Amino acid sequence: MKGEAKKILQGNQLAAARLIRLLEDAEPKGIQILKALYPHTGNAFILGLTGPPGVGKSTLLAHLITEFRQRDLKVGVVAVDPSSPISGGALLGDRLRMRKHTEDEGVFIRSMATRGHLGGLSKTTKEAVLVLDAMGYDVIVIETVGVGQDEVEVAESVHTTAVVSLPGMGDEIQAMKAGLLEIGDIFVVNKADKPGADDVVDQLRLMLDMRTGSDNEWKPPIIKTVAIDGQGVIELVDAFSAHRQYLVETGKFDERNVEREYQFFRRLVMEMAADKIFDNLDDLPAYNDLITNLITRKVDPYTAAETLVKGIQCKI
C-alpha cells in the first residue's frame, strides 16, 4: 500500500493509471491509497474547459498543453468522455485527442467515462484530480463531456472555468444563459476566423454586462481563438494566469479549495449514508410495506421519503 502511494508521489504514471482504475471500480484498495495521498494534495491550479459539443474543446486543449509546457508547467488532464453502452468505458481515447503529448513525461492525460453520471463529469473525476495533484502537476485541466447546459457541475470542481462557444450557434447562446454563462470565469469564442465570430463576442459581452456584481469582482474576459492552428492560445493562458492571481489576491483561491473539499465530503457522506440505510432496510416489514404502497401509488415518492427519514431520525 505505502509502496504504491510512494510511486505516485514520485510521479509514476503507470501507478497513477492503476490507482485511477481502482477508484473507478470503487475498489477498497484504491480508496486506502488515496487516503495516504490526500495530505500531499491541494497545490495544483485546477481548470475546467466546458461548452456544447463540437466547439473544439479537445483541439483547443492540445494547444493549451503545449503553451503550459513552454512555460515549464507540468500538466495533468482529465478528459471526460461519453460511455460505451457495452463496456461502460470511455468512447474517445486520450491518444486520439492529444496524441503528440503522450511521450512527454511532464504531461499525464486520462480519459474517463461518465458511466451515466450527469453534469458533464465522471463520478470519480474528483478522485482522479486528487491523484494528479499528489503527483505534483502544476496545472490540472478537466475537459467535460460536452452535453451543453447541464455541465455546470464542473464549476464546483475547479478554480477557473472556461466556457467555449463558436460562431453559428444562434439561439444556443441564449440557451447557455441559464447554465454555462453563470459559471464562466473566462469565455472563449473558438473558430474565430469564421463569419459571425464578432457577433458571438457582442452577444456574450451584452449578456455578461447584465450580470450583477461589485466593481471589485472579476470581469470575465472574452478570448477569440482558432484552435486548429493555436491562434489566441497565448492570450487564453494569460487569462487563466490573471484569474489565478485575482483569486489568490482576494483570498478566493483558498475559498474555492474549501468549497471543493466540502462538496466532495458531502457527496461521500450522502453516498455512504444511503448505502448504509438501504442495506439495513431490506428485511424490515415496515420498509417493504412502504415500497409496496409507493409502487401501487397509495403514497407518493415525497411522502415515502419523508416517512423514511422520520423513521431514521427516531432511531438516532
PLM-predicted stretches and their roles:
Residues 224, 235-312:
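Long, well-ordered amphipathic alpha-helical subdomains in the mid-to-C-terminal portions
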Residues 186, 192-249:
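Canonical P-loop GTPase G-domain recognition
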Residues 60:
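Hydrophobic positions on the alpha1 helix immediately C-terminal to the Walker A/P-loop
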Residues 3-47, 55, 64-150, 157-164, ...:
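Nucleotide-state-sensitive switch-loop elements of NTP-binding domains
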Residues 156-174, 185, 189-198:
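Conserved Switch II/interswitch segment of TRAFAC-class P-loop GTPases
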Residues 2-5, 112, 187-189, 221-226, ...:
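Short hinge/gating elements
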Residues 52:
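P-loop (Walker A) phosphate-binding loop of NTP-binding proteins
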Residues 91, 128, 153, 157, ...:
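Alpha-helical scaffold elements adjacent to nucleotide-binding pockets in ATP/GTP-utilizing enzyme cores
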